[in-house]
């Protein structure tokens, strides 16, 4: 809570090489926050940018001390950067936004209004995504459907990481301390009073995406994490497939016996054997792969490495870097 007893909103931006966007982002966020009676802080988490992004932030900090900067020691990715921002936020509520201005700052007032109505988590749902190609939208829609089918919680379709989270809900999320958290799923998992706000997502303001849909591994990892974080269904798939293959094998065996005994079918042992071997081999590899994903998550957790390492901080009461 700020010293003037106003409620405080913490806005968190993770970024990588966004020199073409940051100034416009700051201008629009400041304008939006001037329309509400709240104090605020702007936490920019720098994922080891190599362009002029940091210089732009430092220049803006000279006139606006609400701007705070966290510099990572190397590139850790979006999720660790957001977690770092969450842990450093002092606001009564936090909002994480993409730094590319695809999430328009102008709808912050709508999120705040829902928060004022008593909601602890305010999701944003994209009704339209400008600048996105049909293939990406189609694959994304299918991925959401699959995750929804196997997940133990309801993850809203077309809802990303852009959402408002109250201090109460945020503390619950941070207590989980998962090694590879799915940030768009955890707010739904912790519960509390939740709602959603619809908006049209803009095209990127400038520059190119740092997460190309086809060449980047991030979308695939997010999809796998979306399934494994809130569901054990994949572990049972091998059981169900094993049953189906066994049942199918029995039916096929009976079919072969009938064909040979009553219709004089020629010897097909080798072809039948090869089909059975290939099918069972594929199922075994599939089952091992699924279990490997879960074991890999356990292995990663047992390493007990920090999720991120901070090189330096500016604007915080405690500017030491031992928090990770």
Specify the residue positions occupied by each region the protein language model found.
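Acceptor/aglycone-binding surface of glycosyltransferases and processive sugar-polymer synthases
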Residues: 66, 70-74, 78-88, 102-181, ...
């Amino acid at each position: 809570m700020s010293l003037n007893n106003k409620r405080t909103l913490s806005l968190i931006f993770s970024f990588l090489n966004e020199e073409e966007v940051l100034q416009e982002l700051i201008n629009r966020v400041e304008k939006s926050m001037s329309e509400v009676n709240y104090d605020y802080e702007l936490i920019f988490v720098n994922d080891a940018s190599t362009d002029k992004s940091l210089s732009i932030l430092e220049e803006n900090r000279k006139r606006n001390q609400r701007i705070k900067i966290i510099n990572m020691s190397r590139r850790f990715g979006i999720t660790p950067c957001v977690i770092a921002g969450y842990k450093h936020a002092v606001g009564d509520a936090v909002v994480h936004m993409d730094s590319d201005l695809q999430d328009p700052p102008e709808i912050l007032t709508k999120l705040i209004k829902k928060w004022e109505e008593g909601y602890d988590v305010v999701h944003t749902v994209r009704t339209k995504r400008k600048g996105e190609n049909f293939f990406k939208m189609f694959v994304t829609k299918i991925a959401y459907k699959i995750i929804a089918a196997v997940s133990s919680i309801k993850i809203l379709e077309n809802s990303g990481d852009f959402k408002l989270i109250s201090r109460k809900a945020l503390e619950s999320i941070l207590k989980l301390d998962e090694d590879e958290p799915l940030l768009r799923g955890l707010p739904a998992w912790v519960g509390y009073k939740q709602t959603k706000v619809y908006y049209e997502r803009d095209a990127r303001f400038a520059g190119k995406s740092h997460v190309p849909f086809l060449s980047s591994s991030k979308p695939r990892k997010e999809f796998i994490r979306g399934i494994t974080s809130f569901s054990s269904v994949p572990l049972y798939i091998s059981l169900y497939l094993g049953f189906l293959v066994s049942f199918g094998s029995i039916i096929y065996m009976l079919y072969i016996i009938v064909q040979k005994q009553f219709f004089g079918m020629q010897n097909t042992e080798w072809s039948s054997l090869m089909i059975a071997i290939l099918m069972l081999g594929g199922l075994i590899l599939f089952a091992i792969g699924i279990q490997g994903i879960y074991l890999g998550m356990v292995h990663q957790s047992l390493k007990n490495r920090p999720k991120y390492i901070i090189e330096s901080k500016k604007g915080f009461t405690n500017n030491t870097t031992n928090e990770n």
